[in-house]
């Protein structure tokens, strides 16, 4: 998928997940992927759920607005985030030093 792309108020992006991390945080860009560290293990979809919950909480949106569209069993996840503006996304990145 590559770089984040917008369709109206919907963001499409690729995230690289680091499961079983000591601290949940946004680690920065790794190429065209945003790297996110999560506490959850990569078992039974726990890391996928944790990723959607983490992003929703950090963006101040409902969990249902963050959808995993590809990468259920991979560290590389393609997500769709609905109902946010580019300015909210930019604030999120700045808040995490990205």
UniProtKB/Swiss-Prot annotation:
Domain of life: Bacteria
Pfam families: DUF167
Protein name: UPF0235 protein Mmc1_3654
Organismal lineage: Bacteria, Pseudomonadati, Pseudomonadota, Alphaproteobacteria, Magnetococcales
Disulfide bonds: none
Family of the protein in this entry: Belongs to the UPF0235 family.
HAMAP family in the record: UPF0235
Organism: Magnetococcus marinus (strain ATCC BAA-1437 / JCM 17883 / MC-1)
A cellular component annotation (GO) from this entry: cytoplasm
């Amino acid at each position: 998928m590559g770089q984040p792309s917008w369709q109206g108020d919907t963001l499409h992006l690729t995230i690289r997940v680091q499961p079983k991390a000591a601290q949940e945080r946004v680690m920065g860009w790794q190429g065209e992927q945003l790297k996110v560290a999560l506490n959850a293990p990569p078992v039974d979809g726990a890391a996928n759920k944790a990723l959607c919950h983490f992003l929703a909480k950090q963006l101040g949106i409902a969990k249902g607005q963050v959808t995993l569209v590809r990468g259920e069993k991979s560290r590389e996840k393609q997500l769709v985030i609905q109902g946010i503006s580019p300015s909210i996304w930019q604030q999120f990145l700045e808040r995490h030093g990205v």
